[in-house]
Amino acid sequence: YSHLKGNFGTAWQNQQKEFAELPAPVLFTTNCLMPPKPSYMDRVFTTGTVTFPGTVHINEEKDFTPVIQRALELGGYQEDQHFTGINGGTSVTTGFSHGTILGVADQVIDAVKAGAIRHFFLVAGCDGARSGRNYYTDFVKQSPSDSVILTLACGKYRFNDLDLGTIGGLPRLMDMGQCNDAYGAIK
């Protein structure tokens, strides 16, 4: 659904704060839904395996009309907003999946054969909400420039706003989704 895409906010533990003032609907497609506060419950939509009492669930026909109508009603921010990630970055690398990665498999294989990509690292855990829990951030910052970082789970929010550049024409950071998307990374 190319017309429904995006990533707003950081890790799951910040949802209740970050969604409180968001003038837009939020569609949850995977796990990590915190109980919505009444102030934004009418902006939360779910689909697939995730659901929550009191929210509108988009069924298997995937008719997103209620989400689109709510977006039009809310209108979004009146002025451009400036958001930063945990490291101060203003853009994040997100939105890959096993299908996307498999779609560029030839390009990855060519980059490996050419020696451009020599390492793959999978960050598949959570750094947690407390400051000082920076294991994955430090790991990624210290990764060699000839490595690709694949992510699963909320640990990515500790570093997905870092500019790691590209390698072999591909971004060095490829987000494979949440914990429950692990099967795709294995493919």
Feature locations, PLM:
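Metallocofactor- and cofactor-centric catalytic cores in central/energy metabolism, strongly enriched
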Residues: 1-187
